[in-house]
């Protein structure tokens, strides 16, 4: 849900998003949702103690990253309100993708009793579903972004805060 919420917020910020950018966003989120459970599975097999400790903090790490993204959106809305240019953060998409897929890493920890083939299949399905849900989120976000043109950053920040507190 958090990758979809971020996709929706991106769509609101950029209502005229080109299909290439939309595919890149959804593809990046889908890829990270695919690779993180595989990575979690690998960590359990090799570094079990570290994985157990990390699992305790997955929720906090994810919350902090999403809170940062929400604050960044509020700041961007403030700059637009003050008629100033917003700065584009390099690597922002990767930061968003990692922040929204940390929970998928912990899912990989629970795959320890599966075969590698089953882990890849389950992770592939998760990645594909994430890709399509993010496409839908971007589409909805673009519609709302057009509707709320000047307030898209503010609304995107509110949506991310809701994700943090509700999920």
Where are these regions (language model features)?
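Hydrophobic alpha-helical transmembrane segments in multi-pass integral membrane proteins
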Residues: 34-42, 99-113, 161-167
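C-terminal ends of transmembrane helices
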Residues: 7-21, 71-83, 134-149
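Cytoplasmic-side transmembrane-helix entry/capping segments in multi-pass membrane proteins
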Residues: 21-28, 86-94, 149-158
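Selective transmembrane alpha-helices of multi-pass membrane proteins
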Residues: 33, 51-78, 148-167
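Juxtamembrane transmembrane-helix termini in multi-pass membrane transport proteins
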Residues: 1-48, 112-117
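Alpha-helical transmembrane segments of multi-pass membrane proteins, especially transporters
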Residues: 21, 25-29, 33, 37, ...
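Small-residue-enriched transmembrane helix starts and helix-helix packing motifs
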Residues: 1-3, 76-79, 85-99, 124
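Structural signature of hydrophobic alpha-helical transmembrane segments
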Residues: 1-4, 56-65, 119-132
């Amino acid at each position: 849900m958090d990758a979809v919420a971020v996709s929706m917020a991106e769509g609101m910020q950029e209502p005229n998003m080109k299909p290439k950018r939309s595919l890149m966003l959804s593809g990046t989120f889908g890829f990270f949702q695919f690779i993180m459970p595989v990575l979690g599975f690998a960590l359990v097999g090799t570094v079990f103690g570290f994985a157990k400790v990390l699992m305790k903090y997955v929720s906090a790490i994810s919350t902090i990253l999403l809170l940062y993204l929400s604050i960044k959106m509020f700041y961007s809305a403030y700059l637009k309100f003050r008629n100033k240019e917003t700065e584009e953060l390099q690597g922002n998409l990767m930061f968003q993708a990692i922040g929204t897929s940390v929970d998928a890493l912990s899912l990989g920890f629970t795959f320890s009793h599966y075969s590698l083939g089953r882990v890849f299949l389950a992770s592939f399905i998760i990645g594909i579903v994430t890709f399509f849900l993010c496409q839908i989120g971007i589409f909805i976000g673009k519609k709302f972004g057009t509707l709320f043109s000047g307030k898209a950053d503010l609304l995107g920040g509110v949506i991310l805060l809701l994700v943090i507190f509700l999920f």
